[in-house]
């Protein structure tokens, strides 16, 4: 069984709540176990929580769940680009998958509502990567 940690943004919580519930249902469907959930203020705040989870022996992968809606400035792009880069760096540093379930940037609220399945897709990616990395490690 694959053990997952979730890092969930509180910003736009009505949307991240729906994303979280779909992600949990999909984890259960795939036979994965969500062993820990950490709430953070926003997507930009995720890296430290991700790093803390990746240090835990009982976490095989981390799933991020966030929603960054376009505003009047380019703030949404800066948030998502920096979060995505750091998330990828942490995955490589700890040699564990960290799946990007953050919707945005450049989307309206209506588009965000249409993309609540990003959390589900992130769970799918995390579980697949854990299994595939384990296959590589166990092959001759």
UniProtKB/Swiss-Prot annotation:
One of its GO terms (molecular function) is 6,7-dimethyl-8-ribityllumazine synthase activity. The active site is at 75 (proton donor). Pfam families: DMRL_synthase. Keywords: Riboflavin biosynthesis, Transferase. Pathway: Cofactor biosynthesis; riboflavin biosynthesis; riboflavin from 2-hydroxy-3-oxobutyl phosphate and 5-amino-6-(D-ribitylamino)uracil: step 1/2. The keyword tRNA-binding does not apply. (2S)-2-hydroxy-3-oxobutyl phosphate binds at residues 72-73, 115. It catalyses: (2S)-2-hydroxy-3-oxobutyl phosphate + 5-amino-6-(D-ribitylamino)uracil = 6,7-dimethyl-8-(1-D-ribityl)lumazine + phosphate + 2 H2O + H(+). The keyword Amino-acid biosynthesis does not apply. It comes from the Archaea. Coiled coil: none annotated. Its EC number is 2.5.1.78. It is an enzyme of class 2 (transferase). 5-amino-6-(D-ribitylamino)uracil binds at residues 11, 43-45, 67-69, 100. GO terms for biological process: riboflavin biosynthetic process. One of its GO terms (cellular component) is riboflavin synthase complex. InterPro entries: LS, LS/RS, LS/RS_sf. NCBIfam families: lumazine-synth. Belongs to the DMRL synthase family. Catalyzes the formation of 6,7-dimethyl-8-ribityllumazine by condensation of 5-amino-6-(D-ribitylamino)uracil with 3,4-dihydroxy-2-butanone 4-phosphate. This is the penultimate step in the biosynthesis of riboflavin. Forms an icosahedral capsid composed of 60 subunits, arranged as a dodecamer of pentamers. This is 6,7-dimethyl-8-ribityllumazine synthase. The lineage of its organism: Archaea, Methanobacteriati, Methanobacteriota, Methanomada group, Methanococci. The gene is ribH.
